[in-house]
């Protein structure tokens, strides 16, 4: 039987091309599926344990007596306690309990959680399978920085009232960064690099040794290490170690180009000392500690004030200072209604906001203070001292209940760990080391 000529005919060029295109399409689809699958497997988001809340955190009410500077509270009534499982290295912990939207934001080894100030219950949490490196809050967001493949450079922004995810940023960072923040910006820094962000984690400034930078000459001191940094409003102050010589660099916090710092003054501080660090910053001033002396500089480089701590009533400096090597020297600073303060194991020092001129000193302070109406609460050895906010006179001392003292007993031999206070409404938060106790201020 004769076969049709078409049966033995070779495939046409068009048929061959179509077959090849189909094979290529299948291979491409498989490759895309594999890439998506690997991205999902390797994604940090897949390794997140998180909850959110829609419930209102409520509002904090303050007793009218808080505005009477001579009114003395009767007692501190314990209401709840909680623990932080995070490391308490002196350069990574906050100078005060982090309170935002009527919630306490608590650091954990691998995450954060929000605690209701009303009853101490958890409102939301965010946890990952990598260690938490730094925690701060600013511009209405919680910023949690985790360790990633390139050091402690993976930062997530969360809404403090709900735990809602806002943004993520990845950077190259060391394994031991410190948080730096103001009411305008937040960021992290280590001995080599500093960056500031907006609330959406868009970077507004980078400073220091920029990894693989195509324009290294934009940085004023890429060869220098960073000792400490503070920021307020539109000022960023950085103390550098340049081959054993200290330099104070005062610059714009949000320059026109984030890669190019706008330096306003670059001040020679002399030889680097073991205690060299920023201790306070104003809108256009910065105070630097070195060799047991504090010098205050204006943004134009003028020195305004010099104070020898040995001539004050503050306690002598500890024999061992900044023993953690290249770790950032983040000071314990807090703001009061009429002053800025700095605490160290020497005691508490207060500065005038406009000039940073030293204005008061309390050697008996065991940590950072907090305002309550027309009062200031200050931790002391036998409890919490209550001050008239205008005169700064101590009008009385509130003893801490025994339960709170036993909670803090494990940290009694660590004077470098301050007792840190925060007040919201009529709730006083007392934190030392890993413990946080909440008390109702009873009048």
Regions found by a protein language model. Give the residues of each.
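Beta-propeller blade signature
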Residues: 155-159, 247-256
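Surface-exposed beta-loop interaction hotspot
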Residues: 216-218, 311-313, 319
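Intrinsically disordered, low-complexity acidic/proline-rich regions
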Residues: 1-16, 31
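Repeat-blade elements of multi-bladed beta-propeller folds
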Residues: 2, 21, 25, 29-64, ...
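Aromatic (tryptophan-biased) beta-strands that constitute blades/sheets of beta-rich domains
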Residues: 2-3, 16-25, 38-103, 110-111, ...
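Inter-blade boundary loops/turns of WD-repeat beta-propellers
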Residues: 117, 160, 199, 253-255, ...
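C-terminal, beta-strand-rich globular interaction domains
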Residues: 213, 218-219, 225-231, 251, ...
């Amino acid at each position: 039987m004769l076969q049709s000529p078409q049966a033995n005919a070779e495939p046409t060029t068009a048929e061959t091309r179509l077959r090849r295109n189909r094979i290529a399409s299948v291979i491409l689809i498989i490759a895309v599926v594999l890439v998506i699958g690997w991205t999902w497997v390797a994604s940090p988001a897949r390794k997140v344990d998180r909850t959110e809340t829609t419930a209102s955190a409520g509002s904090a009410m303050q007793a009218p007596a808080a505005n009477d500077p001579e009114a003395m509270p009767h007692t501190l009534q314990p209401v709840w306690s909680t623990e932080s499982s995070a490391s308490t290295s002196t350069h990574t912990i906050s100078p005060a309990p982090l309170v935002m939207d009527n919630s306490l934001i608590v650091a954990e080894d691998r995450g954060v959680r929000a605690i209701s100030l009303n009853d101490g219950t958890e409102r939301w949490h965010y946890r990952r399978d990598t260690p938490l490196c730094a925690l701060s809050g600013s511009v209405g967001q919680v910023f949690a920085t985790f360790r990633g493949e390139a050091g402690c450079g993976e930062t997530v922004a969360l809404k403090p009232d709900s735990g809602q995810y806002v943004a993520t940023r990845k950077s190259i960072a060391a394994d031991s960064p410190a948080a730096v923040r103001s009411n305008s910006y937040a960021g992290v820094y280590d001995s080599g690099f500093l960056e500031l962000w907006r609330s959406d984690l868009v970077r507004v400034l980078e400073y220091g040794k920029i990894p693989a930078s195509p324009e290294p000459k934009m940085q004023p001191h890429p060869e220098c290490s960073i000792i400490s940094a503070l920021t307020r409003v539109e000022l960023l102050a950085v103390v550098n170690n340049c081959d054993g010589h200290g330099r104070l660099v005062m610059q714009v916090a949000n320059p026109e180009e984030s890669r190019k710092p706008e330096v306003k003054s670059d001040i020679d501080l002399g030889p680097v000392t073991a205690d060299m660090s920023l201790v306070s910053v104003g809108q256009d001033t910065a105070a630097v500690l070195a060799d047991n002396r504090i010098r205050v500089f204006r943004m134009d480089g003028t020195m305004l004030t010099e104070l020898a701590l040995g001539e004050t009533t503050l306690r002598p400096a500890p024999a061992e200072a900044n023993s953690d090597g290249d770790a950032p020297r983040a000071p314990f600073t807090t703001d009061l209604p009429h002053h800025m303060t700095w605490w160290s194991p020497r005691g508490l020092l207060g500065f005038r906001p406009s000039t940073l001129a030293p204005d008061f000193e309390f050697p008996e302070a065991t940590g950072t203070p907090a305002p309550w109406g027309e009062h200031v609460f200050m931790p002391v050895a036998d409890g919490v001292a209550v001050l008239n906010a205008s005169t700064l006179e101590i009008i009385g001392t509130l003893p801490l209940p025994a339960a709170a003292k036993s909670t803090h007993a494990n940290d009694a031999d660590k004077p470098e760990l301050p007792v840190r206070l925060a007040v919201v409404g009529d709730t006083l938060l007392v934190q030392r080391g890993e413990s946080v106790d909440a008390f109702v201020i009873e009048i």
